[in-house]
Amino acid sequence: MSKLSEIEALLFVAGEDGLKVRQIAEILSIPPTGVSQSLEKLTAKYEADADCSLALLETSNTYKLVTKQAFAELLRAYSKSPINQSLSRAALETLSIIAYKQPITRVEIDDIRGVNSSGALAKLLAFELVREDGKKEVLGRPNLYVTTEYFLDYMGINHLEELPVVTDTELVAEESQLFGQATESELE
């Protein structure tokens, strides 16, 4: 592993905050002049590589990795895409219910939430976090909903089993907190 790649990794993890030369020097136990030379090499490397989307930005002796100006329009379009917008509380509640109770119908979701979930469900379907997965074999044959592979990616997990274990008691307590109601145990 080269010092150059170590500096690059540190700058990547530092994100928008960036790092000062002295911080990098302390972390890597090298003199600040060595860090400055490596930063110059990294800048030259990014500038020379037309296929690289990264650039090194220095402001007030703080360095950070940024995307090259040439990608501004692309990134603006991405930031306006629907999935990059945050999910509403209703959508998050609905998504949680589907994740833990799938396959589940909209009416069953409504019963748990106590309100109509059609809007939240439509948003989750549009974002491809959930999908229809057949029909429930009851009167009216309502659609069943399950989470998608994209949901797993969005949550940063590989399998549904990696979701935190939540007991029914915790769900009731959480729901009562959400809706300002007291559970039986709180009333005793």
UniProtKB/Swiss-Prot annotation:
Participates in chromosomal partition during cell division. May act via the formation of a condensin-like complex containing Smc and ScpA that pull DNA away from mid-cell into both cell halves. It comes from Streptococcus gordonii (strain Challis / ATCC 35105 / BCRC 15272 / CH1 / DL1 / V288). The gene is scpB. The keyword Cell cycle applies. GO terms for cellular component: cytoplasm. It is found in: Cytoplasm. Homodimer. Homodimerization may be required to stabilize the binding of ScpA to the Smc head domains. Component of a cohesin-like complex composed of ScpA, ScpB and the Smc homodimer, in which ScpA and ScpB bind to the head domain of Smc. The presence of the three proteins is required for the association of the complex with DNA. InterPro entries: ScpB_csome_segregation, WH-like_DNA-bd_sf, WH_DNA-bd_sf. Keywords: Cell cycle, Cell division, Chromosome partition, Cytoplasm. This is Segregation and condensation protein B. SUPFAM superfamilies: Winged helix' DNA-binding domain. It comes from the Bacteria.
